[in-house]
Design a protein with these regions (language model features):
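Active-site neighborhoods of divalent-metal-dependent phosphate/nucleic-acid chemistry enzymes
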Residues: 62-110
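Short, structured coil segments at secondary-structure junctions
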Residues: 58-60, 118-119
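Short, well-structured N-terminal submotif of metal-dependent ribonuclease cores
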Residues: 1-34, 43-57
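Alpha-helix capping/helix-boundary segments
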Residues: 8-9, 38, 71, 95-96, ...
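Acidic, PIN/NYN-like endoribonuclease modules and their adjacent C-terminal/linker elements
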Residues: 1, 97-127
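Histidine- and aromatic-rich ligand-binding microenvironments
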Residues: 5, 35, 89-90, 111
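Generic structural signal for small/hydrophobic residues in well-ordered secondary structure
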Residues: 5-6, 42, 75, 100, ...
Length: 127
């Protein structure tokens, strides 16, 4: 399972950037998911009805994995460990990482700087 981060879905919506082709490829393969946090980030950033409609069409094709107790607990462990090491990645990325770890699969992202710090998290390649 490939789990798309916010940045690559934005690339896809814009039709450019490193993530656009990767998202298109994974959509074609039919095993692309995202997280409830990414869904929140995309929808909270809408600036018009048209943009919201476009995002909703994409989200209809990309199921969002929910944050359940196990994902929240895993995210808390991720955040605590990284902050203790002085390498925090913020709450949203901690929740995304916790969700990916909980459900398995690999995260498709351009943000390797943050997500490569998370022990056990598999990063999908963009090419």
């Amino acid at each position: 399972m490939i789990i798309a981060d916010t940045d690559v879905l934005i690339d896809f919506l814009a039709g450019k950037g490193a993530g656009a082709d990767a998202v298109a490829r994974e959509l074609e393969d039919g095993d692309l998911h995202t997280t409830a946090i990414t869904r929140f980030e995309l929808l909270s950033g809408t600036r018009s009805k048209r943009q919201k409609t476009t995002i909703m069409k994409l989200l209809a094709a990309v199921p969002a994995l929910p944050i359940d107790e196990a994902a929240a607990d895993t995210a808390a462990e991720v955040r605590r460990a990284l902050e203790k090491a002085g390498e925090g990645i913020g709450m949203a990325d901690s929740l995304i990482a916790g969700t990916v770890l909980r459900y398995g699969g690999a995260i498709l992202t351009r943000n390797h700087r943050h997500f490569s710090r998370v022990h056990g998290l598999v990063l999908a390649t963009l090419d």
